[in-house]
């Protein structure tokens, strides 16, 4: 799951935080 490389920007930080805060059940 390498989205940071393609999403290098201010949104990447928010997206990464949401993914980390969102439990993938």
Curated annotation (Swiss-Prot):
Provide the function of this protein. Stimulates uterine smooth muscle contraction and causes selective vasoconstriction.
Keyword GTP-binding in annotation: no
Q: From the Swiss-Prot or TrEMBL record, what is one GO molecular function term?
A: hormone activity
Per the record, the domain of life is Eukaryota
Location in or out of the cell: Secreted
What GO terms fall under cellular component here? extracellular region
- Tell me what this protein is called: Neuromedin-U-25
Q: Which residues carry this modification: Asparagine amide?
A: 25
Major localization class: secreted
- Where Pyrrolidone carboxylic acid occurs, the residues are 18
């Amino acid at each position: 799951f390498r989205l940071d490389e393609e999403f290098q920007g201010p949104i990447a930080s928010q997206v990464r935080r949401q993914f980390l805060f969102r439990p993938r059940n």
